[in-house]
């Protein structure tokens, strides 16, 4: 209905009728007639709370704050969790459960994507594939805490590859071995990983680190996870021997 009235008001015949009937012309064009501007819904508006204006309002004198205390003072801010001095609920009960959000998790990479990159010729399966090769070929991006190989659907990996990553699932290791390949999981510290991915940033490469935590030592010495320390006979000698960090320094030409 409002649309019909607005069209009538904007029509030229309606303007001619106004001129012929003697009604004053208020402009070259007329705005559409609408009752929406006259609607009033007082429930959607809350009146301003006026305090300190006498006892009749109920908010005079202390303005609804009461007598003395932190609530009466200026700035009256109470820290979240404060319960007036009694033991807060955050301290009443022991901590339950745990969270793994703070752990440094490696980047997960599926074997299907590795096979796809080999089929495209972006990865060379004739040599050992390292995490630097995966980064340079854009097979995976943003390597911050290493790479973990995961198993996709069985049968996706058809090429025998030799790959070296930080971690791998048992299913991924089994699929690589079924395809006739080999895999080695190697421990990298943050410094060693940065030197491995970006060797041009180092004048002399850092010493290859050894796992320190008990969890990492158990992982990389376990042949079930293809750890690179699984074939080491004397782990203690590896950690405390004189040949702990054998490496050849690279000196750039001046």
UniProtKB/Swiss-Prot annotation:
Any one Gene Ontology BP term: mitochondrial translation
Cellular component annotations (GO), alphabetically ordered: mitochondrial large ribosomal subunit
Region (Disordered): 44-104
Basic residues bias locations: 64-79
Domain of life: Eukaryota
Main location: mitochondrion
Transit peptide range per the UniProt entry: 1-78
Subcellular location per the Swiss-Prot or TrEMBL entry: Mitochondrion
GO molecular function, one term: structural constituent of ribosome
Record's keyword terms, sorted: Mitochondrion, Ribonucleoprotein, Ribosomal protein, Transit peptide
Cross-referenced InterPro entries: Ribosomal_uL15, Ribosomal_uL15/eL18, Ribosomal_uL15/eL18_sf, Ribosomal_uL15_bac-type
PANTHER family (alphabetical): 50S RIBOSOMAL PROTEIN L15, LARGE RIBOSOMAL SUBUNIT PROTEIN UL15M
Role this protein plays: Component of the mitochondrial ribosome (mitoribosome), a dedicated translation machinery responsible for the synthesis of mitochondrial genome-encoded proteins, including at least some of the essential transmembrane subunits of the mitochondrial respiratory chain. The mitoribosomes are attached to the mitochondrial inner membrane and translation products are cotranslationally integrated into the membrane.
Family the UniProt entry places it in: Belongs to the universal ribosomal protein uL15 family.
NCBIfam families: rplO_bact
Subunit record text: Component of the mitochondrial large ribosomal subunit (mt-LSU). Mature yeast 74S mitochondrial ribosomes consist of a small (37S) and a large (54S) subunit. The 37S small subunit contains a 15S ribosomal RNA (15S mt-rRNA) and at least 32 different proteins. The 54S large subunit contains a 21S rRNA (21S mt-rRNA) and at least 45 different proteins.
Record protein name field: Large ribosomal subunit protein uL15m
Native source species: Schizosaccharomyces pombe (strain 972 / ATCC 24843) (Fission yeast)
């Amino acid at each position: 209905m409002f649309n019909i009235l607005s069209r009538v008001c904007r029509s030229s015949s309606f303007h001619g009728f106004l001129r012929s009937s003697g009604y004053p012309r208020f402009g070259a064009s007329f705005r559409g007639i609408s009752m929406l501007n006259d609607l009033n819904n007082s429930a959607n508006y809350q009146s301003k709370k006026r305090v300190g204006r006498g006892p009749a309002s109920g908010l005079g004198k202390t303005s609804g704050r009461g007598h003395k205390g932190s609530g009466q003072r200026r700035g009256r801010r109470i820290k979240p969790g404060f319960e007036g001095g009694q033991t807060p609920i955050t301290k009443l009960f022991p901590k339950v459960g745990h969270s793994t959000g703070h752990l440094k998790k490696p980047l997960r990479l599926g074997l299907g994507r590795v096979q796809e990159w080999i089929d495209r010729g972006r990865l060379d399966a004739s040599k050992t594939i390292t995490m630097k090769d995966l980064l340079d070929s854009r097979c995976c991006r943003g390597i911050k805490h290493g790479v973990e190989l995961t198993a996709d659907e069985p049968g996706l990996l058809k090429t025998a590859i030799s790959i070296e990553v930080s971690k791998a699932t048992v299913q991924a290791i089994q699929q690589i071995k079924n395809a006739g390949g080999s895999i080695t999981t190697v421990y990298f510290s943050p410094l060693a990983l940065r030197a491995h991915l970006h060797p041009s940033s180092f004048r002399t490469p850092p010493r290859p680190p050894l796992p320190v935590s008990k969890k990492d030592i158990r992982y990389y010495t376990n042949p079930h996870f293809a750890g690179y320390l699984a074939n080491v006979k004397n782990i203690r000698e590896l950690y405390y021997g004189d040949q702990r960090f054998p490496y050849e320094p690279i000196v750039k030409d001046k």
